[in-house]
């Protein structure tokens, strides 16, 4: 199980919890550990650290992260928050303050599509539905005037032209699940 902490001073960290509950710090210098996903076919791990305005990728081999590099930076269009991946290996990134979800080609760093929403703070997204072709999008009402954005805090469901993949389940002791 992988998780991170938050720190306004970029003093947070990113951890792995094994099946027995033992935590190992993988890296530090984290502001707000967000959007995590794996491309298991290519041994890649994607990571959003919201205040850095970027999505990074690591090589992921034998449970170890290495070779961190930046996929893209989102200056001026919102901060990357939650994230998921579709079956084509493209990333769908929620942009906090950006009124949208973007579909990102992680190999070129290009935004190849987007879904506009009527709320600023788009928090996360995940594929679901019978064939995983529906994108469920969470939003937040935190720091929002609900008179201006009455749908803030809502969950949206959008039919896409692609399919996502099932989520990974933690295989450890059920007390940690």
What are these regions, as identified by a protein language model?
Residues 12-15, 54-56, 100-102, 154-156:
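A short loop-to-beta-strand structural motif that recurs across blades of beta-propeller domains
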Residues 16-19, 102-113, 126-129, 135, ...:
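Flexible "stalk/tail and boundary" regions
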Residues 37-69:
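Glycine- and Gly-Pro-enriched alpha-helical subdomains that act as flexible
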Residues 1-5, 10-13, 23-45, 74-91, ...:
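Beta-rich, blade/repeat-based domains predominating
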Residues 17-21, 59-64, 105-109, 159-161:
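Short loop/turn segments that connect beta-strands within beta-propeller blades
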Residues 6-12, 50-53, 96-97, 146-151:
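Short, solvent-exposed loop/turn segments at conserved positions within beta-propeller repeat blades
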Residues 21-28, 67-73, 110-115:
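A short beta-strand motif characteristic of beta-propeller blades
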Residues 126-177:
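Blade-level signature of beta-propeller repeat domains, shared across WD40, Kelch, NHL, RCC1
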């Amino acid at each position: 199980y992988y998780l991170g902490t938050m720190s306004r001073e970029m003093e947070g960290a990113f951890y792995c919890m094994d099946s027995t509950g033992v935590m190992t710090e993988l890296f530090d210098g984290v502001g707000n550990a967000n959007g995590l996903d794996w491309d298991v076919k290519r041994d890649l791990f994607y990571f959003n650290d919201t205040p850095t305005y970027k999505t990074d990728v690591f090589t992921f081999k034998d449970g170890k992260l290495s070779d961190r590099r930046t996929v893209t930076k989102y200056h001026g269009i919102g901060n990357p928050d939650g994230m998921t991946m579709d079956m084509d290996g493209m990333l769908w990134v929620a942009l906090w303050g950006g009124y949208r979800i973007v579909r990102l080609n992680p190999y070129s760093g290009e935004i190849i599509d987007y879904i506009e929403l009527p709320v600023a703070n788009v928090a996360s997204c995940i594929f679901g539905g019978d064939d995983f072709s529906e994108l469920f999008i969470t939003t937040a009402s935190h720091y929002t005037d609900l008179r201006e954005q009455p749908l803030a805090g809502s969950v949206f469901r959008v039919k896409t032209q692609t399919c996502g993949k099932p989520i990974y389940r933690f295989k450890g002791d059920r007390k940690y699940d």
